[in-house]
């Protein structure tokens, strides 16, 4: 019996698997039916083999099933059954491959979308490498079990039951003797499953740490080079791989030993069946054809037992994978209802704000009040750790206040607490490089998917990014991960142009000009202020900055102090 972990009960795990099954039930049904039809063909082949041998040896037997009366007819029947077996195997593999990819993609999309739409708690609980490992490896494990392993197991059970009754109809004593290993199999399975599940979880956790180390090291390889710490990371990776190797070795030893014990039992049962058949043949109680059928049916009974021993590790791995995926789904989703748009401008009012990232962290804000009127231009100053970026995240509804309110308001309209539904009014330029790998055009379309080239070039001009016109491929210039191929200043200006394409009445810029020289910064700020003053509805601008050039263009300055 498979038991739940300390975190999830068996019922919770089975309920989760049922939800996954409902998404891929067509493929599971097709695979199960394909397996059951194969079982029928296998037994038909056994019956046809017995028939051919009986005809060849001149033995006649009565049967209620219509059958050929000549050896030629029996041969044609055998060839026909084999042809059906080959065709079914070919078609089954083709369908399983195509539908398997679709099921895997659907599972990954579900996890991917949940992660992107879930609430952000301010601190990532898991390394991105671990998350990717779960999305790719664990989702594949779960899909394979639901769409392939379980349907195969169903077909195996059908094969086992049919083989037992087929053999029982020929020789009851032999059928009972061959299946006597079943109680031992069940007992060993219970002991095996509990231990194997714990080992599998340790292996998956170590595998995630290996992937996290690889990803982070590749991402920061320039830093590792300049700090001359490449040997240290290679040693760290080797240590993790050694741990993984030890865990896999132990898992393999444990699994192989368990299988060896079962195979000894299977071998003994097969030997019993062979000797029993030889003895019965010597006594003249059975024919050569019946002996051949006995041996084949014993294989049809023992084969399922062997296959079930192979299915158990896969099912155990799937339960471990399910737990890891369920952990990713624990974070609640944001409220993604109908967007709340402010068509005539909006401001932000913050009242009695108290916020800390968790119960053990210092309070970033304590009973704080701020007001950013509609159409105003505000600079937010303060030392590192004073809460400037945190304030922006609260306005974006990425974080929730512990106490107090953060509201969006406009004259003539009721104030609304900020949420994912009010995010449509906000345009955000984060600090650092925020470009995606791909073309410049695609990055700009992230701000406005249907933007025309004219609109793109206007936004680029306002952001002082006219250098795009001089690039050989223009808007179709490809950049690498993290904006590779552009300087920090160029990447920052592309990010600002992308933000300008997005329609919103509140613009949030978090150190958006930090990588620009003074002359370019002044030109960009001048373009930005003049452009927004010409709009029918003057937007609200909020700058987080350390630069005095930005402060000179603002009507309001807020200085944050770091709380002790």
Model-derived segments and spans:
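ABC ATPase nucleotide-binding domain helical subdomain, centered on the C-loop/LSGGQ "ABC signature"
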Residues: 109, 327, 405-407, 411, ...
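Transmembrane helices of ABC transporter permease
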Residues: 23, 27-37, 78-81, 148-202, ...
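Hydrophobic alpha-helical segments in the permease module
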Residues: 74-89, 182-186, 255-276, 288-310
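Cytosolic ends of transmembrane helices, especially the final helix of ABC transmembrane type-1 domains
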Residues: 229, 253, 297-328
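An intracellular "coupling" helix at the cytosolic face of ABC transporter transmembrane type-1 domains
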Residues: 18-25, 120-121, 137-146, 150, ...
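ABC-family ATPase nucleotide-binding domain "signature/switch" substructure
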Residues: 390, 427, 432, 443, ...
């Amino acid at each position: 019996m498979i038991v739940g972990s300390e975190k999830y009960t068996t019922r919770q795990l089975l309920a989760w698997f049922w939800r996954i099954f409902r998404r891929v039930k067509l493929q599971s049904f097709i695979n199960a039916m394909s397996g059951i039809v194969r079982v029928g063909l296998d037994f038909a082949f056994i019956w046809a083999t017995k028939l051919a041998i009986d005809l060849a040896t001149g033995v006649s037997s009565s049967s209620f099933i219509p059958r050929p009366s000549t050896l030629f007819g029996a041969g044609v029947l055998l060839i026909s059954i084999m042809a059906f077996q080959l065709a079914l195997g070919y078609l089954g593999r083709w369908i399983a491959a195509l539908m398997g990819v679709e099921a895997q993609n659907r599972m990954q999309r579900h996890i991917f979308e949940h992660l992107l739409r879930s609430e952000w708690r301010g601190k990532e609980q898991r390394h991105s490498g671990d998350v990717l490992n779960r999305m790719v490896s664990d989702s594949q494990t779960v899909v394979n079990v639901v769409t392939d392993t379980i349907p195969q197991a169903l077909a195996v059970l059908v094969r086992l039951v049919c083989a037992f009754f087929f053999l029982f109809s020929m020789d009851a004593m032999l059928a009972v003797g061959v299946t006597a290993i079943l109680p031992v199999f069940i007992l060993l399975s219970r002991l095996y499953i509990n231990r194997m599940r714990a080992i599998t979880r340790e292996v998956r956790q170590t595998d995630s740490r290996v992937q996290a180390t690889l990803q982070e090291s590749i991402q920061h390889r320039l830093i590792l080079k300049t700090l001359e710490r490449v040997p240290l990371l290679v040693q760290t990776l080797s240590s993790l791989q050694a741990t993984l190797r030890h865990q896999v070795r132990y898992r393999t030893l444990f699994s192989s030993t368990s299988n060896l014990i079962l195979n000894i039992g299977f071998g003994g049962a097969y030997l019993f069946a062979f000797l029993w058949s030889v003895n019965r043949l010597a006594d003249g109680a059975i024919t050569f054809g019946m002996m051949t059928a006995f041996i084949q049916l014993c294989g049809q009974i023992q084969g399922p037992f062997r296959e079930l021993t192979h299915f158990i590790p896969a099912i155990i791995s799937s339960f471990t994978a399910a737990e890891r995926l369920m952990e990713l789904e624990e974070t609640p989703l944001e409220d993604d209802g109908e967007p709340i748009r402010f068509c005539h401008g909006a401001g932000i009012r913050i009242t009695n704000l108290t916020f800390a990232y968790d119960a053990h962290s210092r309070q970033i804000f304590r009973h704080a009040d701020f007001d950013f009127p509609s159409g105003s231009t505000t600079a937010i100053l303060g030392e590192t750790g004073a809460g400037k970026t945190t304030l922006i995240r609260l306005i974006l509804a990425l974080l929730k206040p512990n106490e107090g309110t953060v509201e969006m308001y406009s004259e003539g309209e009721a104030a609304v607490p900020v949420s994912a539904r009010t995010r449509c009014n906000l345009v955000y330029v984060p600090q650092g490089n925020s470009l995606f790998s791909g073309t410049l055009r695609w990055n700009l379309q992230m701000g406005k998917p249907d933007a025309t080239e004219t609109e793109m070039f206007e936004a680029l001009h306002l952001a002082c990014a006219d250098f795009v016109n001089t690039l050989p491929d223009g808007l179709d210039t490809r950049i690498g991960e993290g904006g590779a191929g552009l300087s920090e200043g160029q990447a920052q200006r592309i990010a600002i142009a992308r933000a300008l394409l997005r329609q919103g009445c509140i613009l949030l810029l978090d150190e958006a000009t930090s990588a620009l020289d003074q002359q370019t910064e002044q030109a960009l700020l001048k373009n930005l202020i003049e452009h927004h003053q010409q709009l029918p509805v003057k937007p609200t601008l909020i700058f987080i900055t350390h630069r005095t050039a930005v402060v000179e263009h603002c009507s309001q300055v807020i200085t944050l102090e770091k709380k002790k």
